[in-house]
Amino acid sequence: MRKTNLLIGLLFLSTSLWGQDPWKITVSDVRTDNYYGVTVGNGMLGIVSSPEPLRTNNVVLAGSYDKYGRGRVSNFLNGFNMLNGSISIDGNRINRNNISGFTQTLDMKKATFTSRFTYADKADITCSYLALRQLPYCAMMVVEVEPKADITIAAVNTQETPDAFRDGRMFYNEINRRHAAIKLLTTQAQSPTGRLTVCASSAFMFPEKAGEEPRVTHTTHNSNSHQTSFSRKLRKGETYRFCIVGSTLTSAHHPDPMNETERLTVFACLEGYDRLMVRHLSLWDDLWSSDIIIDGDAQAQQDIHNMIYHLYSFVREGSELSISPMGLSGLGYNGHVFWDADTWIFPALLMLKPQLAKSMIEYRYNRLQAAKENAFEHGFSGAMFPWESADSGFEETPVWALTGTFEHHITGCVAMAAWNYYRVTQDKTWLREKGYPILKATADFWLSRVEKDADGSTYHIRNVVAADEWAENVDDNAFTNGVAKQNLAAASQAAALL
């Protein structure tokens, strides 16, 4: 990875000024010419905002890779957009050009993204969405309409098969019970090479009792797009709320992704808005129980919250997945895991939320065998971790980049993350079962990697790409040698403890 500017910090929306609220970032000049988007995530699902009302730009699902695009290596998938809505008032569809007072706000404490705008003199509309923290594969959009006059609204929930996908199939399923009616909009497709089956399902969720909710209709546009819709008359001053709940899975996550996405959507619908929100907010309150507080500098406090928010949004307890430099904010760096995860991101999470950091080092442990095979291929002993890692644990760096072949300091970075996890948690069972196997295998790698002087007095590590990636095929890079020494010392200390 050629490092220019690592974006774990927020690339936000336009040229508007950042506010001083420690928890909220608001833009009031939403423009399309320099719009980057902001992500809400739950550590598994990342949803990137759009400058268009009731829409999102991208959906990224952690652990979903296929070999397509640049480099002949695995890439993150740009998945199904389950929160793809639109709304019309009195027959006129709302868009970016016919609304006023358009603002967008990221609430970092609540992990919600909210757009507010006014349509003519007819209604004020608020649209919020969130990646539900309690449900790793589910998201929810909440739309509130406050009429300024008697109006008729028509809302649409659309699913479109991404262009890179193939063999799309569309389904509509009605689940009717005495106490509930759920109209499921579902799409299934194959990833670009057919490696994965990718599915999404969504449904409207209404506040009315069963039998009193609006009638939902299903329409197919073409072989790649279908939708559900409803209409409802509203009186002046009668605030009305409806939701879109969506789920997405791939065959990398579940053996039967289509049925399971529908089950998860049904589960979320029958949990209901209030229970979904209470649980989501409670879990984010728990995350924010570990915070960094700065007195006297509101902008610095907002900046710190912005950084921590993205770390919490991109890593999930129990997932056994690590984090790409761009997290779940898009397809940058192909979604691959680099040394950034172990060296720069892991220490912060280890101090703030060790249970999140544990997922990152478990990701490495689960791919230890692949690292051993990588070392074997290169004529070394032990374990040699890949410079770019995805789902398999084998090297995913494009061939033209020498980093994948020679930037070996990554192995020491992984080892030090394992050792530091033990040092902070003092979990000796984990050290024995998972930490020490990493430390020993990586130490064995360095023992086979070093070369001794002719007189036997000095060891060298020759022919590496340095931590400065422009320094290619150099000898005795300071960082590489230093982390190798630390790795060997940590392995010895761990062995003595056990």
What are these regions (language model features)?
Residues 126-127, 156-157, 359-363, 376-377, ...:
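Beta-strand segments within the central parallel beta-sheet cores of soluble alpha/beta enzyme folds
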Residues 329-337, 383-433, 441-498:
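The feature captures the catalytic groove of carbohydrate-active enzymes
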Residues 39-40, 47-48, 275-423:
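Substrate-binding groove/exosite segments of carbohydrate-active enzymes
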Residues 153, 252-259, 291-295, 351, ...:
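Inter-helical turn/loop segments and adjacent helix faces that build the functional surface
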Residues 1-20:
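Bacterial Sec-dependent N-terminal signal peptides
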Residues 165, 313-319, 369-374, 446-453, ...:
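Secretory-pathway/luminal and periplasmic proteins that interact with or process carbohydrate-rich
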Residues 20-40, 44-333:
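Acidic/polar, glycine-enriched structural segments that form the non-catalytic walls/loops
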